[in-house]
Amino acid sequence: MKIKFNPLFKDELTIQEIQVHMENGEITSKELVMYYLFQIANYDQDGPKINSILEINPDAIFIAEALDHERKTKGVRGPLHGIPVFLKDNIETNDSMHTSAGTLALATNMSHNDAFLVEKLRKAGAVILGKTNMTELSNGMSSEMWAGYSARGGQVRNPYGDADLFVGGSSSGSAVAVAANFTVLSVGTETDASILSPATQNSVVGIKPTVGLISRKGIIPFTYSQDTAGPFARTVTDAAILLGALTGIDSSDPATYKSEGRAQSDYSSCLDPNGLKGARIGVFNPIPNDSDEYDEQLFRDVIRTLDKEGAMVIEKIDIPSFHREWSWGVSLYELKHSLDNYLSKLPPQLPVHSISELIQFNKGIREKALKYGQDKLEKREQFPNTLRNAEYLNAKLEDVYFSQEQGIDFALKKYGLDAILFPAYIGSTICAKAGYPSIAIPAGYMKSGRPFGVTFAGSAFSEGVLIKLGYAFEQATMHRKSPILS
């Protein structure tokens, strides 16, 4: 006998719709969690085997029941009360789930602490539903590794196409879980394109915040300079709600100190359907027409929409440093330093406590762990862990100077812009090196059915402006379509 679910669940419910239904007694958080588990069983782990989910929280139903009871007896904590959320597998939780970053070496790693952002989610009343699959070590393993693959979890598939359709990464599972309606929300992380790429490839909204808006504490690191967590959702409204819940000053993360007085705990005031009217948006488009991720007609449609909605569109803007030959010294040296430090603090019973030990562990189970090799790890093994050498320091200084003063800030000031529009996620690198925010928005589908998206980018702590622009564009177009899972 099949389980019968509330017919309301057939639709992709938003946070606001769920809260209304819960207040009216039409659905419960427990029922919602059970429905998503059913979807995961039948479409993620069976059927088309999307494979976006790496681990399920065994306490999820209990947590949802407790929050349902609290709603009846004490009231609602806020908009996330009883709302299911998935976390990327590099975000620590103090529960019965593991935190492995997709590696087999850390498959038994259980944290004794919640990441700061997880503490925030629990206090807001969210139900942590589980962990999502990801590109192993946030794409720090191999130059040959396909986006969305991990030795522990296998390959994440794009729900909009066949197995060969690019899924984007490294927060692949987090984006796909939202796109395929296995959850309402998810949290990913980005160093460079890891939120923006899978968001555009899977037709969801992704926000890569200013570095420091969300605490990095409790996240398996890639760099110090560029790492940040950020939300995925099917609508800008839901992404904005989740973003506000994740912000806050963390005494354990100095990067968050600069957000004091600049971060918001509620971005709902930015959700203006007329937000494009009078906005000055610069268009940067250096993509060749033969790129698989670019569609000239769809991008021109975006520009026409901006113009129609009252924006002042300045095309072919100049960003002086965009095409410079960037040094990758920051990611090379900082991954060695940050990951070695993280591994060194792990409990003694775990098999690895350094990058060198991780490399040797993988070699010992080569057939399981090294489908794509580990050349990126091996390259970093010999790097020093002092962050004092000239190559690294000069790379760090150049990244900041050329991405900010001679990059994003230069263009914003020169043209008097509120934001810069990029097709797909081509602006990810310069924004990542600057530590500046971007928002990815669905912008239609190619003739093949492949999703197309655009990103709006701005200066530090301009998330409110970007949400305003993204929301107005979304409401004017309503491009997103649900994938067909069978």
Residue ranges and their predicted role:
Residues 113-250, 423, 433-455:
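Short glycine/serine-rich loop segments
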Residues 1-107, 134-139, 258-263, 267-268, ...:
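Short, well-ordered alpha-helical
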Residues 25, 82, 88, 123, ...:
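Glycine-rich, small-residue loops and helix-cap segments
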Residues 18-24, 105-109, 227-234, 456-457:
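Short, well-ordered beta-strand elements within core beta-sheets of diverse protein domains
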Residues 208-300, 478-486:
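A short helix-breaking turn/cap at a secondary-structure junction
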Residues 11, 236-265, 288-322, 334, ...:
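Acidic-enriched catalytic cores of C-N bond-cleaving enzymes acting on peptides and small amides
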Residues 20-24, 37-49, 65-72, 122-123, ...:
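Sec-exported extracytoplasmic/periplasmic mature domains
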Residues 81-101, 270, 275-284, 333-403, ...:
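Short helix-loop capping/hinge segments that flank enzyme active sites or metal/cofactor-binding pockets
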